[in-house]
Amino acid sequence: MLFRSGMKYRHYAPKAKLVIVEGDFDKFKSFVEKEKGLAAGKKIGLILTEENKGRIEADEVEYVGSRLSYEDIAHNLFAVLRRFDEKNIDVIYSESFDESELGMAIMNRLVKAAGYNIIKL
């Protein structure tokens, strides 16, 4: 299979709209809570790290791992996105990741899966 430039990780893309939200977690939470209020009737999913477990609710929350182990996050990302497909989620909001070393590879895959849909807070 041949990929056009920038499409290498498009196979990561979920069926749902994926939005990466950049900013500290309090801003992330405020943004998502507002969006949930505007998305009546839509199933909302969240991609979070273990550090934020229990800090926000949605129809479906998936944890990719701890920020202390980007290896785990990289390993879990694809499976997490597929689980959202299985649960018919409409919109997914994801935390962003530090773009140093392995974090850059994670963000590269996530950004392409999101179709470059990034909100900077």
Where does each model-flagged region fall?
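Short, small-residue-biased leader/transition segments that mark boundaries at the very start
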Residues: M1-L2
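Short, flexible loop segments at boundaries between secondary-structure elements
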Residues: I118-L121
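A C-terminal functional module that forms or caps the active site or interfaces directly
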Residues: G6-G115
